[in-house]
C-alpha cells in the first residue's frame, strides 16, 4: 500500500523538490528583471530588502528576489580577478538551478546532500545573504581554518560587493579583534572557534566589554555530518592546569607494563603450542574427516579462542584464521562459551588469563589471576580493587562510644581521604591498562616532539592541543615514556550537539547525509534533501573484491595499482590509519612505484599533495584526510585516460566514510572509478560480519590469491556497517541524554552569570542572595516545631561567626513563626550590607574626590565577587558531575536505571551548587575590607581603581586599593 501511494503521489523527497522548483523558476524570473539595472542600483537592493524586512515583510517572501540578486552579481563578476589564499584567479561561477534549489532548502532548515564538485560553497552564499538582511548573527561553520579563510575570501566577495560585511574566525584570531569579527553581517569560522567563544563569554569574561559574541540566529554547517555526528561525542572544553601532578601514573606505569607483558607472553605461548599442533593442516584446503584428528584440532582451536580473548591481534591467531574451517572452529567455541548453560565453564577457562580483552565493545576486565598477579608480582595492593563502603564506615565510627566528637570527625576525615586515594589509584590503574590494551600508536594517536597527539578517527587528521579526558592522556604518556603533563581542570564544557541547538535556525550541507537522516531528524529536527546533480555522475563503481587474508589483499592492491599506473590514471588509495598508510607505502617502495603519502604525520603538505593528486600518473596514499573538504582536480591528460581511480583498502565502520572516498573521483561530469579491496581479517569483518557470511566463506573458499566478488557480499558488508552505525547512534543518543541534564544546568548558571555581568541593579542581586542565605540558614537551624526554643542561640552563634550581625533574641522569640524569624534575619542582614557599602562609597569619595564614581566602584566590586564565586563553585560542580557520571553506571547492579539515578542525583548536586554559590558570595561581601592608598599623580590623569582578591578559600578579605590623583600626602 505504501509503495502504491509513493508511486501515485511521489516520495517525500520528490514532493519537496517539486515544491522548491517553483521557487527556482521565480528566482530565474527575477534574475531577468534585474539584468537592466546598473551596478549601483543592484547594490542598493540590499538596503531596500533590509528596509522591507524591518517593515514586516518575511524572508520567505523576499527569497526569490534576494537569491536573484546574488545570482545576478555572480554573472556580472564573471571574468573579474579574485585572490583566494594567495592565488590569483578569475571569477567563473554563476549558480545553476540545482544550486539555487539547494540554497532554498538551506533557508528552509534542510540539510542538503550535494555531490562532490556540485558547488556547495557557492550555494551557501544565497541563504547567508538572505538571512543577513535581518541584522542578526549569521555564521558559516567549516571543518578547518583553511576552508573558513578560503570561503570568506572567495565567495565572501559576493556579499561584500552587495554591501554586507564578512569576517573570518580562525584559531589565530586575537581576542581583542573577535568582537569586531562578530559584528560582521556574516562570519566564517570553525565549529570549535564558535563554541569556545561561547564558553569564554560565559565562563571567563567578567564584563560586557570582554564578551565577543552577539547571539545565535542562523548557521549553515559545511560537512554537517562530520561536525554533528562524527564529532558529536567530543566535548569542547576550556581548561587550565590542575594544581598538581597525579602521582599514580608515575607509580604504576612500570607495574602495569609488567602485567601486560605477562599477558602477552602467556598468549604467545598458547598460540605457539596451538600452531605446532595445527602446522600440518594450515595448507590443506579440506581438513581430514577422522574423528580423533578433528577432536585434536578442535582442542587447539579452543586454545586459540582463549588467545583471542587475551590478545585479539596475535599474529599466530590471525594466520590460523586464514583457514576457513579452522576459523569456523574458533568461532564455534566462541558460540559455545557464550551460551548461558556454559557460563561457568567459560569463566573457568577465561580464568587462565590475566586480563580479558573485549575488542567488540572496546573494553577489558582483570581476572582473579590478574588481580593476584598484580598483588604478588607487580607490587600492587589488594586495596586497589576494593572500594570502601563509606556509609558502613561512618556508622562504625558513630557507634564507637570510646571516641570523642572531635576524634570521630578526625576519623571520618581520614576515612574520606583513604577512600579518595583508593579511587584515584584504581582509576589510574584502569586508565593505564586501557592505554596498553586498547589504544594503538599510529592508529589512535602519534608521538611527536615528546607529546601525544590525538588522531581524529573519522578524518585521520592530527588534533594538536586536544587531550583525552579522565586521565587517559596521562596514561598514554606514561605508556610511551614521554613527559607526563599535569591533569587539566575543566572550567567550562559543552558538546557540539548542545552548542548548535542554541541557534534559532540551523541548516547544513554535505555530500553524505542520507544514511544518517534518522539521527538528524530525531536529535536536531533537521531533514535531509538529496539535491539532483547538475551533470550526470560518470563514476564506475566496481564490486568489492574479497580476499581470505590481509596478505592476499595487499598483494592484489599492488597489482591493481601497477596495472592502472601503467595506463596513466591518477590513483588515490584510501587507508583507515597512519599505520596502514605507512605499511602500504613500504610495499609500494619495494615494488618501485613512485607515490606520495598524506597522513597525520605530514598533514602540513596537504594542499600541495592534493593539488598534485589529479595529475597524469600520480599515486597518492592517504588516510581519511583526503576524503573530505578537498576537490582533486584532474589535468586534461588524466581526463583523457579515464580520470581518477580510487582504491579503498578496507570498508570503514560508517558507510558515509566510504561514500566520501568514492566521491573524490568523477566530480562534476569528470570520468572516474572506485574499487574496494577487503579481507576477512579486516576489523569490520572480524567483529561485525554475520555468521551467514562466515558460512559463505567456508563454502566458496577460493584458491590462494583469488578474489571473491559478488553483489551479495557487498550487501552483507553493508548490513554489518548498518549494525555498527545503529550501535554508534545508540551510544551518541545515550550520551546526549546525559548531557541534556548538564545542559539545562549550564544554561541556568550562564543566565545567572550574565545577569550579574549586565545588571544595572547589582545591589539588588546581592540583596537577593543575602535574603536567600538568611532564609535558608534560619530554616535549617531554627526548629520548626519550637522556633522560640534553644535553636535561636545557635542561630545567633552562626550569624556572629559568619557575619558582623548581632541578633536580638528576645525580639525574635516574640515573632513565633520560623518564616517571620527568617524574614527578620534577612532584613537585618540587608540593612547591615547597605550600611557597609554606603560607608565604603563615602570613604572612596573622600579619598579620591568627585572624579571617581565611588558608587560605580562598589558595584564593580560586588560584581567581581559574585562572578568569582559563580566560576569557582561551577568548576567544583563540573568535577562532581564527572564523578557522578562515571559511577552511576554501577547502579545497574541494583536493578536501577542509571539515567534516572543520574537525573535525580545531579538535581541534588545542582541545588547544593546554588546554595554554595550564594553562601560564598554573601560571606565574601560581608568580609570586604577597604584599604586606602594615595599616590601622587599628574592632575589630568583619571584615578585608577584596582581590586585584588586574597584568601579566596576563606572568602576574604578583598582588598580594594584606590589610587588618587590628589596632592595630599
Swiss-Prot record:
Keywords: ATP-binding, Cell inner membrane, Cell membrane, Cytoplasm, Membrane, Nucleotide-binding, Protein transport, Translocase, Translocation, Transport. NCBIfam families: secA (TIGR00963). InterPro entries: Helicase_ATP-bd, Helicase_C-like, P-loop_NTPase, SecA, SecA_CS, SecA_DEAD, SecA_motor_DEAD, SecA_preprotein_X-link_dom. ATP binds at residues 99, 117-121, 631. It is a peripheral membrane protein. Belongs to the SecA family. The lineage of its organism: Bacteria, Pseudomonadati, Chlamydiota, Chlamydiia, Chlamydiales. One of its GO terms (biological process) is protein targeting. Part of the Sec protein translocase complex. Interacts with the SecYEG preprotein conducting channel. Has a central role in coupling the hydrolysis of ATP to the transfer of proteins into and across the cell membrane, serving as an ATP-driven molecular motor driving the stepwise translocation of polypeptide chains across the membrane. This is Protein translocase subunit SecA. Monomer and homodimer. Part of the essential Sec protein translocation apparatus which comprises SecA, SecYEG and auxiliary proteins SecDF. Other proteins may also be involved.
